[in-house]
Amino acid sequence: MNAGIGRVSSGRMAMKVTGRCHCGQITFEAEIDPAQVRVCHCTDCQTLTGTAFRTTVPSLPGSFVLRGGTPKIYIKTAESGNKRMHAFCPECGTPLYATAAGADPVSYGLRVGALDRRAELRPTRQGWCRSALPWSMDLTGIERFERQP
């Protein structure tokens, strides 16, 4: 098995991950199931990320630990009326996670781009595809560069 990957009592895969913002002020760790990486194409995620979609993975219940810094919190009200706390770095603005509004959240939707092991995580499903930007569903054929041209 890969380093940092095991099984939890439920039989699901568990992978320990660490994460941080771009400037390093905020650090955290959690356990995730790498088979649960998701892409969301909803218009809220497009706006909140400033791009075509958001990629997240839920932390396993009770495993999220904030190791350093204090994130800024933005509370978003969904179309359903549910409230979600979105955390980001107050210095560099990196989106970090979202969780249910209120005390003692159980699980955190970790932003894959903030995870140190993000290259090991591949999305397994997509949601809100009806809101997807048409070009975002197929990037084949677009000119590619190893670095900024």
Residue ranges and their predicted role:
Residues 2-149:
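A short Gly-Trp-Pro
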